[in-house]
C-alpha cells in the first residue's frame, strides 16, 4: 500500500470549492501519516503565499486557512511550479515555510520508484 500521496492542484481561489476538496484530501493523507506533497500550478501557486489562502467555500465547509494550518502541522509540503509562479510576478520570499519552488523534475524525484497515491484537481 502506498505510504505517500501527491495532490496536483491547478485552481486557486476562483474556485474555492475545488481548492477545499483538494486540501481535505491532502490533510487526510498527511494526518493519516502519509508523506504528502501538493504540486501547485497555474493560479494555485498563490495558495503557497503566506496569508493568501483565506476563503470559506460553502456553508459547512471548513475555512481554507484552517486546512492550510492542519496540512502544515501534519508535515505536508508544497511544491510550487516556478514557471507559473514567475509568470504571475510573485516574490518567493513570501512563500510559506513548507513550500519550495520546483517543477516536474523535483516532483518525480520526490515520487521516486515507490508506489504513490495521486489526485488531480
Annotate each predicted stretch with a short phrase:
Residues 6-20, 52:
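Short, glycine-rich nucleotide/cofactor-binding loops
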Residues 19-33:
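Histidine-anchored nucleotide/phosphate-binding helix
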Residues 44-58:
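N-terminal beta-loop-helix "entrance" segment that forms/cooperates
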Residues 30-31, 72, 112:
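Anion (oxyanion) recognition and catalysis
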Residues 54-87:
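A glycine-rich helix N-cap at a beta->alpha junction
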Residues 119-120:
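Aromatic- and Gly/Pro-rich donor/ligand-binding loops
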Residues 88-114:
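C-terminal structural segments of small proteins and small subunits
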Residues 36-41, 78-82:
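Short internal beta-strands
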Amino acid at each position: 500500500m502506498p505510504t505517500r500521496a501527491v495532490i496536483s492542484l491547478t485552481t486557486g481561489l476562483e474556485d474555492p470549492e475545488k481548492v477545499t476538496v483538494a486540501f481535505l484530501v491532502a490533510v487526510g493523507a498527511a494526518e493519516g501519516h502519509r508523506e504528502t506533497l501538493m504540486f501547485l500550478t497555474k493560479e494555485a501557486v498563490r495558495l503557497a503565499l503566506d496569508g493568501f489562502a483565506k476563503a470559506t467555500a460553502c456553508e459547512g465547509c471548513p475555512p481554507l486557512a484552517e486546512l492550510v494550518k492542519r496540512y502544515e502541522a501534519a508535515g505536508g509540503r508544497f511544491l510550487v511550479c516556478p514557471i507559473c509562479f514567475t509568470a504571475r510576478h510573485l516574490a518567493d520570499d513570501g512563500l510559506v515555510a513548507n513550500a519550495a519552488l520546483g517543477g516536474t523534475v523535483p516532483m518525480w524525484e520526490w515520487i521516486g520508484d515507490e508506489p504513490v497515491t495521486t489526485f488531480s484537481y
